[in-house]
């Protein structure tokens, strides 16, 4: 049994979100939530919300036991970048890329070996 949750166009760079995702990959959901709760990174809040959504999906849609769930897969892909302009001296301008990320979390019970 698997349950999926996604956060598309998350306002953080994929590089920064991957640092957080790598910490919880393969852990049980209660351990992962504990790590994310006390992480000082902004991306930890985003990943935690997606993980909580995946847990709720597993409980509601599949009737899963929350204590048996673990983070089977967690992926952070790049989303589109928003282009912004910062004015500079002598009429020039610099381009700023405000990056986004797509965060995908898959939780499964221990019986579904992967």
UniProtKB/Swiss-Prot annotation:
Keywords annotated in UniProt: Ribonucleoprotein, Ribosomal protein, RNA-binding, rRNA-binding
Gene Ontology BP, a term: translation
Signal sequence interval, chain numbering: none
A molecular-function term among this protein's GO annotations: structural constituent of ribosome
Gene Ontology CC entries for this record: cytosolic large ribosomal subunit
Quaternary structure and interacting proteins, as annotated: Part of the 50S ribosomal subunit.
Family of the protein in this entry: Belongs to the universal ribosomal protein uL22 family.
Matches recorded under PANTHER family: CHLOROPLAST 50S RIBOSOMAL PROTEIN L22-RELATED, LARGE RIBOSOMAL SUBUNIT PROTEIN UL22M
NCBIfam families (alphabetical): rplV_bact
Known function: This protein binds specifically to 23S rRNA; its binding is stimulated by other ribosomal proteins, e.g. L4, L17, and L20. It is important during the early stages of 50S assembly. It makes multiple contacts with different domains of the 23S rRNA in the assembled 50S subunit and ribosome. The globular domain of the protein is located near the polypeptide exit tunnel on the outside of the subunit, while an extended beta-hairpin is found that lines the wall of the exit tunnel in the center of the 70S ribosome.
Protein name: Large ribosomal subunit protein uL22
Organism: Aeromonas salmonicida (strain A449)
């Amino acid at each position: 049994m698997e349950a999926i949750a996604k956060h598309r166009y998350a306002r953080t760079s994929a590089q920064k979100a991957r640092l957080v995702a790598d910490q919880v990959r393969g852990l049980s959901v209660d351990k992962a939530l504990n790590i994310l709760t006390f992480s000082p990174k902004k991306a930890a809040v985003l990943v935690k919300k997606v993980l909580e959504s995946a847990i709720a999906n597993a409980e509601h849609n599949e009737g899963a036991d929350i204590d048996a769930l673990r983070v089977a897969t967690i992926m952070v892909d790049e989303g589109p970048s928003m282009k912004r302009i910062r004015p500079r001296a002598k009429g020039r301008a610099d381009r700023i890329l405000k990056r986004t990320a797509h965060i995908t979390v898959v939780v499964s019970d221990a019986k579904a070996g992967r």
